[in-house]
Design a protein with these regions (language model features):
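Active-site scaffold of zinc-dependent metalloenzymes
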Residues: 92-119
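Bacterial N-terminal signal peptides that target proteins for export
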Residues: 2-11
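Metalloprotease/metallohydrolase-associated module, dominated by Zn2+-dependent proteases
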Residues: 38-97, 103, 150-231
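Bacterial Sec-dependent signal peptides at the C-terminal "C-region" and cleavage site
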Residues: 20-34
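Short alpha-helix carrying the canonical HExxH Zn2+-binding catalytic motif
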Residues: 118-127
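Catalytic Zn2+-binding segment of zinc metalloproteases
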Residues: 126-142
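Bacterial N-terminal signal peptides
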Residues: 12-20
Length: 231
């Protein structure tokens, strides 16, 4: 039995790195509003179970790697919206203070199995789902910590059009927030360790035990050098 690595390359963590919103309150002198702060919007996990014919997989299904016949496609979504208040010092210089950050999180899981999939294959892919959901459980705490590190930050900007420069800076900061979230979340090593324990669903390893072992031991076992590099 064979099962796909659930990550589809890099778990599609970066799929929305470039999707963000930003805002700018541009004024010469203005105190932060009472509504200032960081807000995390964590959406419920969305799960879809899909079946397909191995000989004719649907167009919207991610391609299977060689030797695979199923996969759990986990898409972690992160969108950041950053707002700041600008204090202009002269015609071409200003200081932007970050006053509000909103981060929206999501996890979309599509489990793809062939119509003739065995129960072991189905259970193996569900193990990948469990790992993804484990990491998503505390994703809001991670996003909150990252957003908090940007709140109140002051950034100097220069240019002939300070409104444009402020928007560019806020846009870049939104990117940085989602980049950091995706980098720190990173369930990929755990998913890879799980596949190693179960041989992609081909051995008799208990799924529940394999998931628990991968989560508990990933920090140690994922850093050990492979005895067969490149395999």
């Amino acid at each position: 039995m064979e099962a796909a690595l659930s990550l589809r390359g890099l778990l599609v963590l970066g799929v929305l790195l470039g999707v963000f919103a930003f805002g700018c309150d541009f004024s010469s002198r203005r105190e932060p509003s009472e509504a200032s702060g960081a807000t995390i919007n964590k959406r419920p996990v969305a799960i879809a179970h899909r079946t397909f014919e191995l000989a004719a997989p649907p167009a919207d299904m991610p391609p299977l790697s060689s030797g695979e016949n199923a996969q759990c496609d986990s898409n972690f979504v992160s969108n950041a919206s950053v707002r700041g208040e600008t204090r202009q010092t002269d015609a071409t210089h200003a200081t932007v203070t970050i006053t509000r950050i909103k981060v929206t999180l999501g996890l979309n899981i599509n489990i793809w199995v062939p119509t003739d999939a065995t129960q072991r294959v189905i259970e193996h892919e569900d193990g990948h789902r469990q790992i993804s959901e484990y990491y998503y459980q505390t994703a809001d705490k991670l996003a909150e910590r990252i957003a908090a590190s940007y709140m109140g930050k002051r950034v100097e900007i220069t240019g002939t059009d300070l409104a444009v420069e402020s928007s560019k800076m806020l846009q870049q900061m939104a990117r940085e927030i989602t980049d950091e979230y995706n980098r720190e979340l990173n369930p990929e090593p755990t998913q890879l360790l799980y596949d190693g324990i179960t041989d992609h669903g081909r051995n008799e390893a208990n799924v529940k035990d394999a998931v628990a072992h991968a989560i508990k031991n990933v920090a140690v076992e994922s850093t050990q050098p492979s005895s067969n590099p490149g395999n």
